[in-house]
A protein has these predicted regions:
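Long, contiguous amphipathic alpha-helices that act as assembly "spine/axial" helices in icosahedral shell
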Residues: 1-23, 84, 169
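Sequence/fold signature of self-assembling virion shell proteins
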Residues: 30-71, 78-83, 89-171
Length: 171
């Protein structure tokens, strides 16, 4: 049973694990995270213009980019970041960024703008199945985002053998 649950988690995480891979193209012919998704009004991007590790600057830029998101016609949709999804390798960085009242990694006495403005209200979640140790994702409040469908739910069965006492199990 644990193996089946693990497989389900791995396959679900693969959506994000392959998000930057051009070999995993979606319906528009682009990877999930791309700088040139084709839309009616031209192209749109859903990743940083320049790839960056998780830090104060990249988190703030991500939230600025999310706030500037537009629909397929180029109209602003006033999106907001809701939760950050990170691999376990970034949990300490995320904790400092999301819980410190002051700016992280600096002696300045500035406030932590992300925290004081409540820009990521649900904080962060660690996904232990993410394989890229420096990739981070931000879930937004935009409806109809990533969805998970179970086309055919897993069925299990057990059968005991009276003669040998063995139990057979299948999924």
């Amino acid at each position: 049973a644990r193996s089946m649950a693990n497989t389900k988690q791995v396959k679900a995480a693969n959506v994000l694990n392959n998000a930057f891979s051009s070999s995993s193209a979606g319906g528009d012919g682009k990877e999930l995270c791309a700088t040139d998704h084709p839309i009616v009004a031209g192209t749109d991007r859903n990743e940083l213009s320049t790839a960056a590790d998780l830090n104060e600057t990249s988190l703030e830029q991500s939230l600025i980019d999310i706030a500037a998101m537009t629909d397929e016609r180029g109209l602003k949709i006033a999106a907001r970041g809701v939760k950050m999804i990170i691999p376990s390798a970034l949990q300490f960085t995320a904790e400092r960024l999301m819980k410190s009242s002051g700016r992280t990694g600096t002696a300045d006495n500035d406030i932590n703008a992300v925290v004081s403005k409540g820009m990521v209200p649900q904080g962060y979640a660690v996904n232990h199945y993410l394989t890229d140790t420096d990739a981070f994702f931000i879930k937004t409040d935009v409806p109809n985002g990533l969805k998970h469908f179970v086309r055919a739910p897993m069925k299990t069965a057990m059968e005991g053998d009276f003669t040998t006492g063995n139990v057979r199990y299948k999924a």
